[in-house]
């Protein structure tokens, strides 16, 4: 996964008034925290933040910090991002400082591959889990988890425990949880009902 860079500034003051003033000039208030450091209040340019989380990796992109005194050069991921519901503008961001040698927990989107056999036969494909919780080293964070549905027939499902993930990547969700399924009646059931 490609590492992005973002410029930050430490901020001395916190609170609603300060945060509003920052947002008015195109900056997003935030905090950097992680193992071995005290939380540090920061601000980041809204456009830089948007550019850092765009693309397949999204919020799981590795981000290198520039500026911010002692935070310069540290690698972070976006732990929490709040947006205004109507405007979609950033309200605040939390960065989690990571160590490249320690596993992290991330939320990764599911990408369906192929056309389900059951869907071709008139069934309805239902994506139950749009994302999965994974644990892996930062360098192993996938942009998405591919789930091949090509052979998925009506009345069948794919569960978390059936996924084949890369070495070192572990799914944290319940292994019995359904990711995707195909619902509907098979041709045999339809024929019996008509007869």
Curated annotation (Swiss-Prot):
Belongs to the bacterial ribosomal protein bL25 family. CTC subfamily. GO terms for cellular component: cytosolic large ribosomal subunit. GO terms for molecular function: 5S rRNA binding; structural constituent of ribosome. This is Large ribosomal subunit protein bL25. This is one of the proteins that binds to the 5S RNA in the ribosome where it forms part of the central protuberance. Disulfide bonds: none annotated. The lineage of its organism: Bacteria, Pseudomonadati, Thermodesulfobacteriota, Desulfuromonadia, Geobacterales. Keywords: Ribonucleoprotein, Ribosomal protein, RNA-binding, rRNA-binding. Coiled coil: none annotated. InterPro entries: Rbsml_bL25/Gln-tRNA_synth_N, Ribosomal_bL25/Gln-tRNA_synth, Ribosomal_bL25_b-dom, Ribosomal_bL25_C, Ribosomal_bL25_long, Ribosomal_L25_dom, Ribosomal_uL5_bac-type. The keyword Translocase does not apply. Gene3D superfamilies: Ribosomal protein L25, beta domain, Ribosomal Protein L25, Chain P. CDD domains: Ribosomal_L25_TL5_CTC. Part of the 50S ribosomal subunit; part of the 5S rRNA/L5/L18/L25 subcomplex. Contacts the 5S rRNA. Binds to the 5S rRNA independently of L5 and L18. GO terms for biological process: translation.
